[in-house]
A protein has these predicted regions:
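N-terminal secretory signal peptides that target proteins for export/translocation
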Residues: 1-9
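Bacterial N-terminal signal peptides
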Residues: 8-22
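Boundary at the C-terminal end of the N-terminal hydrophobic targeting segment
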Residues: 25-27
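Signal peptide-proximal N-terminal region
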Residues: 30-32, 56-82
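Extracytoplasmic "Venus flytrap"
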Residues: 32, 38-59, 86-91, 114
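Second-shell loop/turn segments in exported
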Residues: 43-50, 83-87, 106-108, 155-163
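Short, well-structured alpha-helical segments in soluble
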Residues: 84, 88-107, 127
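Extracytoplasmic ligand/sensor domains, especially the bilobed periplasmic-binding protein
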Residues: 107-167
């Protein structure tokens, strides 16, 4: 139960963070492109139930934000779109999923059920953002708790919601 509560709390924080990227703006009459969110988690294999639980909670949060008109940006209100990618719990699959997500226009990558996958995604996102600054991606880590992710491997494009394992 505690694990579910912590997961729920982290996912709620992800939704709030997405809202915090907003700036007060009026909605223009034309439809703006949505903010693309990519969830990269193990949706198959031994931890599929954990990935599916994360997906259910994020779908609920996205629907709630969109029901209120989306997130306010400088250009106006934008809806959120959540796309799921199955990493199968493997780092190589996570990297393949990241490339697919970026190619599909993802602006935010969400992952958290594996510190190993988080580490490879952090590195790949930093390299991508250096190579293609016009297509930057932000990594939202809601549960990977390896202390190295915010210590020796820390980078600007990684935001972690949870305390690390040493805390």
């Amino acid at each position: 139960m505690l694990v579910f509560f912590r997961l729920w709390s982290r996912l709620w924080q992800v939704g709030i963070l997405c809202l915090s990227f907003s700036v007060n703006a009026q909605t223009p009459s034309l439809q703006l492109p949505p903010v693309q969110l990519a969830l990269i988690e193990g949706m198959s294999g031994p931890f599929a139930n954990t990935g599916e639980a994360v997906l259910r909670n994020l779908v609920w949060a996205v629907e709630r934000v969109n029901a209120r008109g989306g997130v306010a940006t400088q250009e106006g209100k934008r809806k959120l779109v959540l796309n799921r990618y199955d990493s199968k719990g493997q780092s190589e699959e996570a990297l393949t999923s990241l490339r697919s997500a970026i190619d599909s226009g993802a602006q935010f990558v969400l992952q958290g059920n594996s510190s190993a996958n988080a580490a490879v995604l952090m590195d790949a996102i930093q390299k991508h953002n250096e190579r293609e600054p016009q297509k930057r991606v932000l990594f939202l880590n809601y549960a990977a708790v390896d202390p190295a992710l915010t210590q020796e491997k820390c980078n600007f494009w990684h935001f972690r919601f949870d305390a690390h394992a040493d805390m």
